[in-house]
Amino acid sequence: KELSEDAFLAEAKEIKKLTQRYGVPLIINDNVALAKACQADGVHLGQGDMQVEEARAILGDAAIIGVSAHNVEEALLAEKQGADYLGSGSAFVTTTKQDVTALPLKTLREICHAVQIPVVAIGGVSAENINQLVGCDVAGVAVVSAIFAQDEIETATKKLTAQVKDMLAKTETFDALYQKLMPLLQGKKGVLFDMDGTLIDSMPMWRTLDVEYIGR
């Protein structure tokens, strides 16, 4: 963000060549004019940035437009305005941005369940905490320091990619178990079961512990 406009554009064009070679979409953060100038695949907009409709008019119908959403209301509005995906967070405490408060995972899950478009978890996601996103129904994650703050960027990228795939697979398993078990558990105030679907316990106290201590 400290680069001059010309330097930023030159670097964006070089990155575009690289992402195009590997079939990876290039999404520019905030800057719609730059996204158009470098022929990026899309743009990500914050709550204080240009409206989705304006960005769409500039970039065209094929552009991928993402919007930051920190609660269900923002998520629903962005979806209504035509966003293609949401970036929600901060999922965890992050050092990349200052004065950012982590969302409860409950809120992240509520956002995912409220909209029909993909939701990407952003903020503080790392190799150490990514499995906490299992069951939140996120479609993916966005990271900075988890890769670029590491000594071996390529190694960190490969490791995190594998962990993301594993997290998404576990989420699919979690959702399948949920759909299977819920009809059997109607009327229960709280249940505890492991990831292979084995019911461990069913008592009202679990619901209290869930809300009061886990915050989910």
Model regions: which residues?
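Glycine-rich phosphate-binding active-site loops on the catalytic face of alpha/beta enzymes
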Residues: 1, 47-54, 87-99, 130-163
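N-terminal polybasic phosphate/anion-binding patch
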Residues: 1-9, 212
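Alpha-helix-loop-beta-strand connector modules within alpha/beta enzyme cores
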Residues: 9-27, 47-71, 99-127, 160-168
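Catalytic cores of alpha/beta
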Residues: 26-41, 55, 70-82, 114-121, ...
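Conserved SAM-binding loop
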Residues: 27-28, 44, 67, 149, ...
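Asp-based, Mg2+/Mn2+-dependent phosphohydrolase catalytic module
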Residues: 139, 149-158, 162-189
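Active-site neighborhood of HAD-like aspartate-dependent phosphohydrolases
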Residues: 180-216
